[in-house]
Structures are given as C-alpha cells and as structure tokens.
Amino acid sequence: MISFNNVSKVYETGGQSVHAVEDVTLSVEKGEIFGIIGFSGAGKSTLLRLVNMLERPTAGTISIDDKEITSLSTKELRKLRQRIGMIFQSFNLFNSRTVFGNIAYPLKLAKVPKNEIKERVNELLKFVGLEDKANNYPEQLSGGQKQRVGIARALATSPDILICDEATSALDPETTTEILNLLKKVNREYNLTILLITHEMHVVKEICHRVAVMEKGKVIEEGKLFDVFTQPKTKTTQNFVRSVINDHLPESVLAKIQNGGQIYRLTFTGEETGQPVLSYIAKNYNVDVNVLYGNIIELQNVLFGNLLVELQGEQREIQKALQHLRLQVQLKEVEAHAS
C-alpha cells in the first residue's frame, strides 16, 4: 500500500544540513494499522508529511499502490490527497463553522453535489456518534468530540489511507481509549489503512498491528506488535516498552532481597500465562519463590505474561526448578538479574 524506499529529508539551516529523515525503508500493508513511535525530534511528523507530499523527499522514493508519487503533477497530486485523510493533535477545526460545516468542507472543495454532501455528512455524524451535535460549534465541544469531528472530516471523501498525527496526545486517558476504539472501528468497517505516529507506547499497544521505532531520523526497529513488545532489541525500544510494562525494581525492594537469592525474568505467551508453574516448582523442588513483579497484557488478542521472581535455595535445586520451567512451561526467556 505505502512504500518508503531509502527515503531521506534534509533541511539546510544556518549553513548546516539537518537530516530529519535518513534512509528510511518501510512498507505499510493495505488494511493494517501501522504505528511509528519515537521521541520528539525523531522524524515521525516529517515522515508523515512526505506521504501526502506536503514535504518532498531529498532522496529516495515513496509509492502508494505501487505508483511512485514524488514525480506526480499538480493535478495528480490533488487526486492523491483526496485518497488520504488526516487527523491532528490540535484538531484543526474551523471555529466559524458548525460540526456539519466542518465535515462538509472537503466535500465542498471536491465539488460534491449538495444533496450528496448532506447524506454523507449525516452518515458520518452517526458513525462517530455525534448526530445531536451537527449544529454545534467547536467551542461547544469537548476534546474527544472535537477529535470525532476531525475523524469524520478526514473520512468525508472516502479515503484509502488515514494519517493520524499524535491524534490522542491532547486527550485524557478515558477519551483516548474512546478515540482509539473509534479508529479501530474505522479500520475494521472501512478497511482503511491507518498510519499513526505517537510518542506513547500504550497507544501503539492498544491499536497497532505493526510498529516502527524512529530515532534521530532513522528507523531503528520494526516488526509485528507482539514481536517488538516481547523482544525489543534496542535500548530506545526497551524504554518505550517499559512505559507500559514497568518491571524496573526499586532499590528499596532489591535491598530487602536476602543474601543468596537470585532474580529471574520469566515471560509467557498465549495459554502458558494460565499455568500454575510457580506453585508447582515450590511444591516439587526445595526452592522458595518470591514474586517481585508480575503482569499480563493482551497484544493483538495474544496474552503476554511477564514475571520477575526471586528463587532461594541450594543452587542444585534452583537449577532443577529452572530446567522444569524451560521444558514444561515453554519458558520464553529466563534472565538472571543482579541483586
């Protein structure tokens, strides 16, 4: 659907070259929700602006449906942009227009007949749950309602691609969940390809099928959501994952661990998360088990469990217990931690 091939964007500032995007190669499949995460200045927003040619790449090519877009004429570019909807962190609504007027705006630009505009806007108002707000103005709406208007407006021209630029960053947690559920509904019912950028890993966890991590203009890690979450390779990705799975033990906890105790990280996937493995080894081996941290999250309908445990006992018994864990519980990873 969307392909970036060795794409770079360089700005000349004060006689210096700034690489906002550097040699990025990515593919976004049709109908998926693809997340791009990174800290401020990572190059996320610049990469998005390249998709609809608000910025042109300094090097490399960008293709949509196998058609290279960097050389499109003005007329062709106008048609392309009608296929791409966009929602923003700051909503970008017209304060002087009603909710109906904001949603209708791109249809008027496309010279859609008035009766079709009315039908389409009413359809979208129902879809985003704002049927009773058609005649309200943006100042009369909550942040979540404003973003719903933004989503409806982005869908007005029946695009193939929806770009989300930090779409939930200005919202409270409850409203964020509501908007993410709406975006999942958009993806499911319209089979829309969604390209989303954020600096919040919990947003990626809730909605994305695949994710790329950007740092200093480069993609440093990319893959399926489950793989990136459960096996983060880079330090930056590990830090993002810890914002959702904060398994860092406080010094006060480490200080209480008895001499001779050993800490292990256990990770479980799927049905493994429901197995009583710790009670089994406590009963069948001469080992004391102290759970220091544990959680279970769901990633694309697959459970992922994460435990940090302290094992106390003779080294021989601990090794027997670990061997059982590895063989019987399909232990994904056991990692010793220094206390």
Curated annotation (Swiss-Prot):
Instruction: Name the UniProt key words of this record, in alphabetical order.
Output: Amino-acid transport, ATP-binding, Cell membrane, Membrane, Nucleotide-binding, Translocase, Transport
Domain ABC transporter residues, every copy: 2-241
Q: Where along the chain is ATP bound?
A: 38-45
Broadest EC class assigned to this enzyme: translocase
Q: Does the keyword Chaperone apply?
A: no
Q: Which InterPro entries match?
A: AAA+_ATPase (IPR003593), ABC_transporter-like_ATP-bd (IPR003439), ABC_transporter-like_CS (IPR017871), ACT-like_dom_sf (IPR045865), MetN_ABC (IPR041701), MetN_ABC_transporter-like (IPR050086), NIL_domain (IPR018449), P-loop_NTPase (IPR027417)
Q: Which reaction does it catalyse?
A: L-methionine(out) + ATP + H2O = L-methionine(in) + ADP + phosphate + H(+); D-methionine(out) + ATP + H2O = D-methionine(in) + ADP + phosphate + H(+)
- What cellular component GO annotations does this protein have? plasma membrane
Question: Which EC numbers characterise this protein's activity in its record?
Answer: 7.4.2.11
| Molecular function via GO | ABC-type D-methionine transporter activity; ATP binding; ATP hydrolysis activity
**PROSITE patterns named among the record's database cross-references:** ABC_TRANSPORTER_1 (PS00211), ABC_TRANSPORTER_2 (PS50893), METN (PS51264)
Gene3D superfamilies per record: 3.30.70.260, P-loop containing nucleotide triphosphate hydrolases
Q: Name one Pfam family in it.
A: ABC_tran
* Assembly information from the UniProt record: The complex is composed of two ATP-binding proteins (MetN), two transmembrane proteins (MetI) and a solute-binding protein (MetQ).
Protein name, UniProt field? Methionine import ATP-binding protein MetN 2
Q: What is the lineage of its organism?
A: Bacteria, Bacillati, Bacillota, Bacilli, Bacillales
